[in-house]
A protein has these predicted regions:
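Secretory/periplasmic and organellar redox-cofactor proteins
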Residues: 2-4, 12, 25-26
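Histidine-anchored nucleotide/phosphate-binding helix
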Residues: 15-30
Length: 113
């Protein structure tokens, strides 16, 4: 099975749209794939409770995509766990998560253009 971890660190609306498109393309290209989207820095804006893409992200989650948020970023921005959409999970450190996943053989993609 293929495994990919995607980093989103931008809150640019065009990058967010491109990321959603890329996620759909990944799902359409592979019958069996594990996908994690890890958001850190300004990228967490996509998964905040007031996100314009709430329903789109929820549908992607229902198709198996995991959305992970950096706890360090939440702390830095003084946001609590309830600030993110309920289907998202929290990782202690996005950077550490990327290192772990790459060590485990996961592919890494920087979201956007």
């Amino acid at each position: 099975m293929y495994k990919v971890v995607v980093q989103l660190s931008s809150n640019d609306i065009l990058v967010q749209k491109a990321t959603i498109s890329q996620l759909n393309n990944i799902l359409n290209a592979f019958e069996s794939i594990e996908v994690e989207v890890v958001m850190n820095g300004l990228g967490i804006d996509l998964i905040l409770t007031e996100s314009l893409y709430h329903h789109t992200l929820e549908r992607l989650h229902e198709k198996g995509i995991q959305f992970l948020v950096c706890k360090n970023t939440l702390n830095h921005r003084n946001l609590g766990n309830t600030s993110i959409l309920p289907f998202a999970s929290i990782v202690p450190s996005a950077i550490a998560h990327f290192i772990i996943r790459q060590h485990e053989g996961w592919s890494y993609i920087k979201a956007g253009f």
